Design a protein with these regions (language model features):
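Structured catalytic-domain cores with a bias toward divalent-metal coordination
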Residues: 1-373
Length: 373
């Protein structure tokens, strides 16, 4: 194992940020996994799981159990970690311009498609190597205008040629859930079973280029553009939502890290255990991200929930109220679709149009940008 420090572009004189990168195994030997924690810097359960994961991976590396190459960024957003506003941590949006740290990650698809045009054939192994080299070259050619651009670019360079990318996040109040590409449903189910996920949200494009899709979608698009070529989806990239922001127990973090380690074992990144355990039963079936129903406040007031994260909701069921503090009127909010309420806000004051909760339904068919701000 070794630790590398990557300096980010400076914002102002006297102020520096850097990324710490932990590496296990040997680059170029076997499958590569890239794991990063808390790109949304206030989603701190990811930071704790990363520490547990580091301990487990370091022990495995010392024992010669890392067959491939594992890159772990234990805190993926030093800029966001430093942001405080009125004594409150602000880690989701850049205070400089309000941009979401996990949106508009550079999309290398067009550059790579041009680089490999007419060069993909019937040899899948050769095709994967060619596309990976083109991805590395495209990422190396990116330039940054500010520290946040540089952050996204440096993280992308660490992960763009990986077989597996695990982007560790959490929600406000939530159960374990995952986001992934629709064609990679089987791998999402395997990881979801190990983690005990209660929702798995799938899409071919969620909008605004989040980090996981910046790594996986180039493969999907190239395969769509060149169906005659033998080109597998060679990067499995997923966003892992590690429950809610207050779920920071040590035992829970060790459990989640062990599940991620087991997934890496099953994918050949780590040596298999001497006595492999059977895959746990899946706690949910994947559903389309387009079917996820946002529960939206009809006006301002105090929020009262009738459902807890992880509970099933029936179509038409009352899930929350918003109580007007001028009139005392209680505005009930009913779900349109059936499914599990997998996340909700942690605060209890609503403004008109605020997203209060999310239900993993199957009947809606939303279009456009499918993720929240």
């Amino acid at each position: 194992m070794n630790i590398e420090t990557l300096e980010l572009a400076r914002a102002t004189p006297g102020l520096r940020h850097s990324l710490q990168v932990h590496r296990y195994g040997q680059p170029g030997r076997g499958p590569k996994a890239a794991i990063q924690a808390a790109l949304h810097a206030d989603e701190v359960p990811a930071l704790l799981v990363a520490q547990a994961l580091h301990r487990q991976l370091a022990a495995l590396d010392a024992a010669g159990q890392v067959l491939g190459d594992v890159v772990l960024v234990p805190y993926a957003n030093p800029v966001g970690l430093a942001q405080q506003l009125l004594a409150q941590h602000q880690g989701r949006f850049d205070l400089r311009d309000g941009a979401n740290f996990n949106r508009h990650v550079p999309d290398l698809t067009a550059t790579v498609a041009a680089a490999v045009a007419g060069r993909l054939g019937a040899d899948a192994v050769a095709n994967v190597a060619l596309v990976r080299e083109a991805l590395r070259t495209a990422a190396a050619g990116l330039s940054a205008r500010n520290p946040v651009d540089d952050l996204k670019i440096q993280l992308l360079r660490l992960a763009i040629d990986a077989d597996i990318v695990l982007d560790l996040h959490c929600d406000a109040q939530a159960v374990m859930h995952l986001y992934g590409l629709t064609p990679q449903s089987a791998l999402c189910e395997e990881l979801g079973a190990l983690l005990g996920a209660q929702a798995i949200l799938l899409a071919t494009e969620s909008g605004d280029s989040p980090f996981d899709e910046a790594c996986s979608r180039p493969w999907f698009v190239l395969k769509e553009q060149q169906p005659q070529a033998a080109l597998p989806l060679a990067c499995f990239s997923t966003t892992v939502e590690l429950r809610g922001e207050a779920d920071t127990g040590h035992e829970l973090a060790e459990q989640d890290a062990a599940a991620l380690v087991e997934f890496l074992r099953r994918r050949g990144v780590l040596a298999p255990a001497s006595a492999a355990a059977p895959l746990p039963a899946l706690r949910c079936q994947p559903t389309p991200l387009a079917g996820s129903e946002p529960i939206v406040a009809p006006g301002s007031g105090v929020v009262v929930f009738h459902k807890q994260p992880g509970e099933q909701v029936a179509a038409g069921e009352r899930v929350a109220d918003v109580v007007d503090v001028d009139t005392g009127e209680c505005q009930a909010i009913h779900a349109v679709s059936a499914g599990v309420m997998y996340a909700r806000v942690a605060t209890r004051w609503a403004t008109p149009g605020k997203r209060l909760a999310k239900i993993a339904g199957t009947t809606l068919a939303r279009t456009g940008k499918l993720l929240s701000a």
